[in-house]
A protein has these predicted regions:
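Phosphoinositide-binding peripheral membrane targeting modules
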Residues: 17-71, 75
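Generic hydrophobic, helix-prone segments enriched in Leu/Val/Ile
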Residues: 9, 15-16, 37, 89, ...
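Short, surface-exposed secondary-structure junctions/capping segments
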Residues: 62-70, 95-111
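Canonical phosphoinositide-binding patch of PH/PH-like domains
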Residues: 72-95
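Anionic N-terminal interaction surfaces
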Residues: 1-30, 47, 84, 100, ...
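Charged/polar, solvent-exposed surface patches and flexible loops
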Residues: 56, 91-95, 114, 118
């Protein structure tokens, strides 16, 4: 049986985890100790990410609008999630992690232009 790491829950919302081919719909539990995701199909395939192991969390921002998708980087892996409440999740993460670990991810155009620039950059 799944055992939560959190003692108190600050936000409970629905979302999608993109860990394999196709997404898994489930519930987010964001609390005092960790960010947790429990799939609706099989709760035993849960994802628990303690705040201490997160190195960076970010989402795409255009204007003042935060995208539904957000990315979590840990010491060992990278997780991709989507939620209608991604802005609320990032605000709670900022309280636990600090401003330096919550970042604005580059847009698709910025990523493509950076790769093109790196192709034509002088190599010494």
């Amino acid at each position: 049986m799944a055992q939560s790491l959190n003692k108190t829950v600050e936000l409970h919302t629905t979302g999608v985890s993109y860990m394999a081919i196709g997404g898994k719909v489930g519930k987010f539990l964001i609390g005092d100790m960790a960010l947790e995701f429990y799939p609706d199909v099989n709760v035993e395939q849960y994802i628990q990410i303690p705040w201490t192991s997160i190195t960076q969390i970010g989402a795409n921002v255009s204007g003042k609008r935060v995208s539904r998708h957000f990315e979590i980087l840990t010491d060992k892996s990278k997780f991709l999630f989507a939620s209608k409440d991604s802005g609320k999740i990032l605000k709670i993460a900022r309280e636990h992690l600090g401003n330096e670990k919550v970042v604005k991810l580059p847009t698709l155009i910025q990523t493509i232009s950076a790769r093109i620039k790196s192709l034509f950059a002088k190599k010494s």
